[in-house]
């Protein structure tokens, strides 16, 4: 039995493994390991979690005592051990452990669970080895560390503790690299470009620029190309997306300006993928990318239309074809990215264009017509998705401002239908979104709200909603007060908007409100 095997057997006999912060307990375990255990022998005989635990205990013990003497070439063994530990904890199917065959790949969740189980111990080992032996990690090991640093724990293989250790370790390693932009360029060229080479969409050329004459996509191509040969980043190396996300978050505008062609194929491949988690991650990354990407390059290269065409299909990922929860995740991310794109497509400085013909104006109009209104027609019975659409509508209107008046004929009926629904109190989140959406309509389109037809429909919607909310006061519980305040605020905004037209609208609204209050005194609380 080898030294490490003996140590592993001792670890396996433990009922529980102590927390990583319990240094004294770890040193106690380390003290019980065989005296002849060395880094060289550990490197030769590594094994899964028990091996990582034994290694961690060994390192914590040797870190606090000088009884174990390491040979002069221990640093080389430590470097080799770092690479081996990184391979073990990486969120990749483990061919060495016999998990992968040509026709049988483990599920993504299975790989993520295994990596999540091993990562806390492996990352702790890497941190100790790097500190004790002043190791500069090789790029592949660094990629594994990066894959555990995603913000918001968006990857299922990382935890809060693992993320903290990985970020700390990464920060230390980056201090040893004189030019971080060189590392980013190396990752983009030598790691990400080969991984995504076969899954590049037809909309861009191999150099990442807009294709002037793109080939028509085969509708069946997506299924045929969804393989490990075409998408190794999806099936063979789950680090790739997390690493790309880190590159986008880390790169400054100068790096993006110089290396942008290397980003585009990866972004479009993610946006084109049919798996919800990947497409959504691509949308989140695109939003971060656009935030820093120079507007002039976006405009002059034609990439704005490429991104628009890549994201827009996601707006139609709706039930019943797409599960409701998946649809919500995708819609929120897609609208956020498209709104960011609209803000970045302002006309050139000094160039005055009518709103309807400007790139930003056309995109916002398209978002409402082909996005919100089209989707609402199909998903009225899915109240959670309706809430998302209403919240995004408010954001779009705030971007359009007065130019949103052209859409009043669709905006007012959509909001009125939700507010007037007798069962609206059953979905308070959707009701709240409709009220806030109507506030955005009033705030941006107030000059046209003196039109009697619009005014009557809005008053009716507010009155019906106010009565419903008060009738269902007990059912709404804590949400009642919030909804009541927002409804009163909306009615007040409508009154102010009517006064702002400097016409007969204000008097008409006051007369209508007084008549309603005379018939139902409860409405005095609405029209204060």
Predicted regions and their residues:
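Residue-level signature of the C-terminal ends
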Residues: 32, 36, 58-66, 88, ...
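HEAT-repeat alpha-solenoid elements in large eukaryotic scaffold proteins
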Residues: 4-11, 47-66, 114-129, 160-170, ...
